[in-house]
Amino acid sequence: MNYKIIPMTNDRVFKSVLSSIEARDYLIDIISGITGLPKANLKKDMTFVDSEHRISSKKISDLVVEVKDNVINLEMNNTYYKKLVDRNFEYIAKLKSNLIGESYNKIRKVIQINFDNFNRYNDDRAVIKFEMRDEK
């Protein structure tokens, strides 16, 4: 029997693998390494959110987890195209809009981690960090 191997870059495989109990420590390592959130907090408090909501006409978000005051969206981007940044910003905005109704004092931070299967920036770093924030 011939089997086809579906790559980890496939959205459904990406979500299935990273949300599996077998990969939980790996996911915790990724999130902690990128965000600085303590692994112990992630291990104790991380919950998976049903992320099967549509964010744009074709796409569902890949993997969404909540940890205390944070909502973290993990996205696999297979190819670069002109509107990719807009699409990723739309994901953040949708997650933020889902938090409406929470007290503004308690509204959770949304963090998006993109796994890009391309090198758009001609940069050898494994992690390139972009932030929308005020340093003051």
Q: Where do the protein language model's features map onto the residues?
A:
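Elongated, amphipathic alpha-helical interaction scaffolds
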Residues: M1-K136
